[in-house]
């Protein structure tokens, strides 16, 4: 039987092949790649996969980042060179170390996390997290917990007001 993790791995590998082939066939697209984050909830478990610096968060009582960025600044945090708080403003914040479509194969990181009714799941691109601190994301989501559409709009608005120049992707789901 196909597991959620194997389903993610197969879907991401298929997407990777498409992007990689496009980049190989069209000189103007050479070197292109993208990030991906996906989630699937089954019973009381969320299965998550990511590549790059798009993130998955769970809001239970507090906002918790589940995924780990595939980025130079994340490696700098892990090695103790910089503090986590410095990631958003670091000059190398946009250098990712793993992407979809840049190599002929790619492997996502996969996570499993327990979820409960009332939890809020957030999947987002770095267009949000480079502009809005986690504490502010948590505040906005908590204040708008009854209206996920409004919460999403407010997160995008906050990123834009902070000077957002990147694409901002936000998916919110309340269980």
Identify the meaning behind each predicted range:
Residues 1-175:
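PP2C/PPM-type serine/threonine phosphatase catalytic domain
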């Amino acid at each position: 039987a196909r597991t959620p993790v194997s389903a993610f791995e197969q879907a991401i590998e298929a997407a990777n092949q498409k992007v990689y082939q496009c980049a190989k066939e069209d000189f103007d697209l050479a070197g292109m790649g993208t990030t991906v984050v996906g989630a699937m909830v089954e019973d009381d478990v969320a299965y998550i996969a990511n590549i790059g610096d798009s993130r998955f968060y769970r809001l239970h009582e507090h906002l918790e980042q589940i995924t780990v960025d595939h980025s130079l600044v994340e490696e700098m945090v892990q090695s103790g060179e910089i503090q986590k708080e410095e990631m958003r403003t670091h000059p190398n914040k946009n250098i990712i170390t793993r992407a979809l479509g840049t190599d002929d194969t790619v492997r996502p990181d996969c996570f499993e996390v327990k979820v409960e009714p009332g939890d809020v799941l957030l999947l987002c691109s770095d267009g949000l997290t480079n502009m809005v601190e986690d504490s502010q994301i948590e505040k906005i989501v908590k204040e708008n917990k009854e209206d996920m559409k409004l919460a999403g709009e407010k997160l995008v608005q906050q990123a834009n007001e902070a000077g957002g120049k990147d694409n901002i992707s936000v998916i919110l789901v309340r269980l």
